[in-house]
Amino acid sequence: MRIGEPARKHGVSDADILHAVRNSMRWVEVDDDLTMLIGAATDGALLEVGVLDIHGDDPVAIHAMPLRRKFYRFLSEG
């Protein structure tokens, strides 16, 4: 997975982005191209990571930041 420059906007490290993606606990399909993943950084802090073309040959993380309240509801879904 590539990490696009916009994913670094909020100061999340590449290592934390990749860790959150590899250990994601929820996937939220935002639209046909964008999937938000909820996963933990290397220190356990929850992150939201936006990935374009997640099922394609060249997925790109374009967003990463600490998990916002609006995504909390997805944590309680099975």
Kindly give the residue locations of the regions a language model identified:
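Ribonuclease/tRNase effector modules and their secretory precursors
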Residues: M1-G78
